[in-house]
Amino acid sequence: MPLSVFAEEFAEKSVKRYIGQGLWLPCNLSDYYYYQEFHDEGGYGSIHRVMDKATGNEVIMKHSYKLDFSPGILPEWWSKFGSLTDDLRERVVSNHQLRVSREAQILVQASTVLPEMKLHDYFDDGESFILIMDYGGRSLENIASSHKKKITNLVRYRAYKGNWFYKNWLKQVVDYMIKIYHKIKILYDIGIYHNDLKPENVLVDGDHITIIDFGVADFVPDENERKTWSCYDFRGTIDYIPPEVGTTGSFDPWHQTVWCFGVMLYFLSFMEYPFHIDNQFLEYALEGEKLDKLPEPFAQLIRECLSVDPDKRPLTSLLDRLTELHHHLQTIDVW
């Protein structure tokens, strides 16, 4: 939906608000939120900033099309019914044709261990669903873009080895990666696989980071129900597809997650992806000359995360390696 159309229609946008336990309340978005501004958009739909009328808090509204809708179920304790006035309760209806999205289910489950991922509201307008979540700050991709020109020039002229600014940027990158690892591992341990981990889906607000966009996320079965993940289960960004998806037609979610860390480390170091052609990752043509100018432990970690053999990636030692690398960057002046 074009931005101008959505902004103009917001005040009168008729939706159904999910109250819980299969109940819906016909209403307008403007009954609960003030529209503020457009934030971002993609193939899924669009992101907008709105203000909660009840609290005055700025929150994020994600408007997603039902092109690839996966239904979910919210637990019984997730309910808005108790906060309704008597006259609103009379308008609540049961609609078995409406379902909440799997993304909403994942957010509610994730918020039990990561409160910043709380789902505040859920709406359905027939053609799309709308999620209301906390505002988590700037995306890591946006932060990186603010340094892109300087880093690109340092890389282009091979002037980044030993550069003070670049060393501090690498240290910041590793700090981000450690925080991202903790969040992703917590989610993975409760059975949630993000499936699209990248800087665009990491928000930074001071010292805090939030993982966002669970539109293609999936549930990880326990070891007793372990399934084979086929290439069709990978629905993330093409620049983050691990080689085993193409060579064997299957992959392991954690192996792919570690691969994503390698791609992110490379991208944030050089402001470009390690593989530029759609199928180049199958040939694994890393540019060694660039990596050789990084601190050796940094370059080695990228190489291992981007190993063609999934079992040779630092599957169990990634956090330790990142922590050691962070300490190494703090103790060296130049390399």
Curated annotation (Swiss-Prot):
Its EC number is 2.7.11.-. Residues 33-329 form the Protein kinase domain. It comes from the Viruses. GO terms for molecular function: ATP binding; protein serine/threonine kinase activity. One of its GO terms (biological process) is intracellular signal transduction. CDD domains: PKc (cd00180). Keywords: ATP-binding, Kinase, Nucleotide-binding, Serine/threonine-protein kinase, Transferase. InterPro entries: Kinase-like_dom_sf (IPR011009), Prot_kinase_dom (IPR000719), Ser/Thr_kinase_AS (IPR008271). The keyword ATP-binding applies. ATP binds at residues 39-47, 62. The active site is at 196 (proton acceptor). Pfam families: Pkinase. Belongs to the protein kinase superfamily. Ser/Thr protein kinase family. PANTHER family: KP78A-RELATED, MAP/MICROTUBULE AFFINITY-REGULATING KINASE. This is Putative serine/threonine-protein kinase 040L.
